[in-house]
Amino acid sequence: RDKLVTGVQTCALPISRPALTLPASALREPTWRGIVDYAFLCERDTWRRMDAKDELSPLLHDRPATPGGAPYWSALARLTAVERTLKQFDDLIARLAAQGLDVSGERRELAALRERAQAEGDSDALYLAARHAKRQLFFRDPRLAPAANVLFTKRHPLHPSHNYSEHMDGQPVSGGGICVLHVPRDADGRLDPAHAEVETLFDGSAGVARHPVADFDGQTVFFAYRPEKPEVDGWSSYWHLWSVRTDGGGARRLTEGPFHDMDPVPLPDGDLGFISTRCVTRFLCWQPQAYVLYRMKRDGSDIRRLSFANLSEWDPAMTRDGRILWTRSEYQDKGADFGHTLWSIRPDGTHPELVFGNNTPYCYGHAREVPDSQELVCTLISHGDHQGPIALIDRSKGLYETDALTSITPDTRPQYQMDRTHQETFRFPEPISRDHFLVSHSPGPRPHWGIYLIDRYGNRELLYLDPAISCKKPTPLQARPRPPRLPEAPDPALAAQGLGQFTVQDVYEGLGTAVPRGRAKYLQVSQEVPPFLERMSCGEYRSTHPPFTDFYATPVHKVKGLAHEIVTKTRNALGAHAFRQGSAVANSNGTLTVTERGGWPSYVAKAVLGTVPVADDGSVNFTAPAGKVLYFQLLDADRNELQRMRSVIQLQPGERRSCAGCHEDRLQLPATKQTTLALTAPACALEPPPWGAQPFSFERVVQPTLDRRCVSCHDGAKKERLDLRGTLDADLVPASYRALVSGGWVHYFDWIYGARPFKAEPMTFGTLRSRLFEALAKPQHKDVKLSAEERRTLTAWIDLNCPLWPDYIYRPERAAARPSSLCPTAKP
């Protein structure tokens, strides 16, 4: 057996070989070759059933195998199983010959197979013979050396209901552990999986182990483990971080407490990043606890929060330049199903930024940088689970374009919205060269996962499969370069005040011609209010919230609006996807009109923290609180919203951040300017609104304006008029809120599931598109004189996306929790 390439000794724990426990009906013969044949036949069947209508299908759109290369995938997808195998065999011969390998024997073998094909056509026997021949050549590639020692986990699939609920409703069946697969080379120098051996570093049979990752020197492995028996009597069982040496010794638990700690990632300075529920917030859009990015010393001390997101995040990995790449969920005023995208952040928690994915119909997981390339490899996941096809992302094509995506497992259709599949699918790609990737693959009709090697040309070869238990998260166990340690430079004066600083060079950059210079007067900083968890008497935090919509800041199951039209230039909204909500129509001027039909206003509580002035040259310079989920809104002189940031941003204490404009092209260099006007003076403090910077309450802020100016006529006495009283109905919804929202008098972005992804054009949503203000401008309302402050209460509410309550109190308990100063409850 090969020694680890790091030079450390292989462990002396017993070596195990898998028992062949797959049903006899699944195998042609009960041997390793029978398992390989099973994998081959599964591959043949999935290619035959390739979806011809999906946007990423090569039967619909062709794509190259390498960035900027010739069309490749469409022709390959149209071949029979034998034709495709022989084509890939021929291409593989050419690529390895170019590396200097002697492939004369394979050329003769290919010629013989082609002769057989003329007589046998697409027979099973010929297909299997061709696949075995290609497999033997594939394993000769010298670039597969990192696959000689593969770290992975054995565990049963969790099968959660959502991609963010594994810790709540996943099915953690005990068994497995942290293992190393040692793959020898045969006499001809090729990898020989038939004689591979498995070594157990950590026995997880009394629970479930997951997500192992080796330190940069390859001598320590970090992972998460959840024991079947809770560590504290009366508590649930939790995922906690563990470490073990690669000689199999020194296993120890690193974290503890009523929290789930998962997905470790070694940091360049020797610390560990990880994902945790220590944020003690709920994942809004359903029931479970949220989990976000943290860091700590490798002994479990000095735990520090890096991400202040309100939703969940997972699977962090280091980039070559020293940042953390990970998946973040965010639904800031948009539908949920495509809101799981790729982000990066510095290890000190500063400068989180989108890497890829907003406004595409896909979700992205397990992203890794591809060596010797600007590409990323990832799994195209769904809102429902963490598996799907493996895709390459060509970042030179932009941050939001589906043209940047190439599925290299096109026989697996992407899953959309809440779709999920546990068979004939992939997850956990790990690059070992520019062209090759370790993956977990469930090849057949059973949800059973093995370890595969695949490449960007559509080749895939089984490396290891245990018929008794799934094998997941393969990574090379070897030393690897340590990324640079990025400098930290917080401003101590700002940090002491719990603040950071933002500067914007020119808010008009990115707005196009829709907003004339001089119209933007204010930048408003708003907050998504976190839904903190209830602490239970036993010391744990509440883990589920059924029925979940009764814990929302707006009961969207009890009140919703009408269809809204919004203008966009995002072509992804027209894609060949099964969107569950709304429609999109192309306009003659190159834009699209998206109709959103779900009618859900914001179910997240919001707060206006304050505004700052926009200088004459469009620049802004201001301080803002650190540790909060923020977003920006650009306002005119009347506080009408011109454009909205439908993503989130944060600050660490003392952090300084800058941007070029509002919705600018982030792949373009900003215009060179002299010092902006806003930077010639000290940073502005946020000016809070007249009602205060606390979470926004419709009843506290908006209803008094309606009482003063509207209720004298709109008192519910006449059915043809809106009832704008604050009286609560049986659902605890004010009559005024229901009338304005359900009657279609206000315009907002739809939060419903299944919505289309798009970036809205300026001034095509919110206050400026609301019928309410059109009605107020008509003659019959000539005597309604709103003060500037009263008008601002209405515009702020609409442009916060019409939230109702400032908190997440369980709806049936709201009546008892209501301050007496708020509007009365209707009598039964």
Show where each model-derived region lies:
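Aromatic- and Gly/Pro-enriched helix-to-coil junctions and flexible linker segments
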Residues: R1, A12-A77, R108-E115, A125-H132, ...
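Long amphipathic alpha-helical scaffold segments
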Residues: A97-T200, A206
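Residue-level detector of Asp-centered blade-edge/turn motifs that repeat once per structural unit
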Residues: A145-P146, F216-D217, L267-D269, T319-D321, ...
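Structural motif
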Residues: G175-G177, E231-W242, R282-V292, K334-W343, ...
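Multi-bladed beta-propeller domains
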Residues: A187-G207, R245-H260, K297-L311, R346-C363, ...
